[in-house]
Amino acid sequence: ERLFAEGGFFTPDTRARFVATTLARLASPVSPEWPCVLNPGRIRDQWHTMTRTGLSCRLSTHIQEPYVEIHPDDASRLGLEQGTLARIETPHGTASVRVLLSRGQQPGSVFAPFHWSAQNSSAGRISALVHGITDPISGQPESKATPARVVPVRVSHYGFLLSRSPLRPQRLAYWAESRAMFGTSSGTTLHLALDLDAAGIAAWRHATLPAG
């Protein structure tokens, strides 16, 4: 049975009601400790947590990693550079993502897509950072305005691996996996970052990559 198929609502006379409310301040405003507003949202080619769209190589090619979009002035003040890693912190958790500079982003606000999970990223779960405050009437969460801060993540090396089978290398400071096409067959692209010295990189490469 389809909900509201007959046009009625859960009111005494089955008619819809408009509820007038007074515009309220944010339940958790920004502060010196949490100076940014985290605005989670969607990107063009993915749906929710990518349980279906994430299986498509074509849809995964457009944007392959979780990221935080930030105004260049904010990035300069925070010591963030395009393409490097940043950690988004809120009172509820942290996420490590790529930095994307955009003058279209409002200063003081950062955007981050919520599609990535522990299945395809090391620490890209943006939804885990959002507070659980909801509107008392509609139940709608105040998910577009969680106070946050963004700090640089220092690593020694960036790279990526292409593989026809899923990879889970050890000792990575960051990783994000996406589907990819290799000729007529599919596989995965693993974007990664390490924080190791030269000897550590050599040992990691020997343990991770096939000989030859």
Predicted features by range, described:
Residues 1-58:
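Long, low-complexity segments enriched in small/aliphatic residues
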Residues 49, 53-69, 73-212:
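Long, contiguous, secondary-structure-rich segments that constitute the structural scaffold
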